[in-house]
Amino acid sequence: MGLHIGSLLICVFLGILPFATANTNRSGYEEQRNYLLNIFHNPLVNDSIKEKNIPELIAFYQRYPTDVPLSDADRQQFERFIHDYREYREVLVDGVPPQGGSFGNIFGHFLGRVGTRYISSLFNKKREEGQSNHANSPTTLPSRIQKMTK
């Protein structure tokens, strides 16, 4: 009897676990997306701060590769940017990665083309989700109107 109850509890726990982690993953996604939008979609943030956050942008892109709609051409350009960025960071000067300077050219090229489209797609997806959440939220009629419909 005790073994059956223990097995049942394990099954229930394993059944609930995916739902709990899905909600946690979703909130992590939202938190990271908002963080990136606050940096890359904000004209008041300077390029050096944006450059420092490129690793987070790349990590987000790789963690959620299909969540942001991109054309095949934009996706290929973004992949190329990631390759160029990593190649640049692998070059060592006196045993350390470059500390700035020439990377601005790569970053400027990225922001001017695919980065802007990626961030815009990320922002537009957020706006669309906000509108659909608002549209799907249940509306409660005022009580006097509810009484009339009964």
Swiss-Prot record:
Q: Which InterPro entries match?
A: Turandot (IPR010825)
- Record's GO cellular component, any one? extracellular space
Q: What is its main location?
A: secreted
- State the source organism's domain of life: Eukaryota
Give me the stretches of Polar residues compositional bias.
132-150
Signal peptide interval: 1-22
Per the UniProt entry, what are the Gene Ontology biological process annotations, in alphabetical order?
Answer: cellular response to heat; cellular response to oxidative stress; innate immune response; response to bacterium; response to heat; response to oxidative stress
> One Pfam annotation, family name?
Turandot
Location of this chain's protein in the cell? Secreted
* Residue numbers spanned by region Disordered: 127-150
Q: Which UniProt keywords apply?
A: Immunity, Innate immunity, Secreted, Signal
Q: Does the keyword Ribonucleoprotein apply?
A: no
Entry similarity comment: Belongs to the Turandot family.
> What task does this protein carry out?
A humoral factor that may play a role in stress tolerance.
This chain belongs to the protein called Protein Turandot X
Record organism:
Drosophila simulans (Fruit fly)
**Lineage of the organism:** Eukaryota, Metazoa, Ecdysozoa, Arthropoda, Hexapoda
Gene giving rise to this polypeptide? TotX
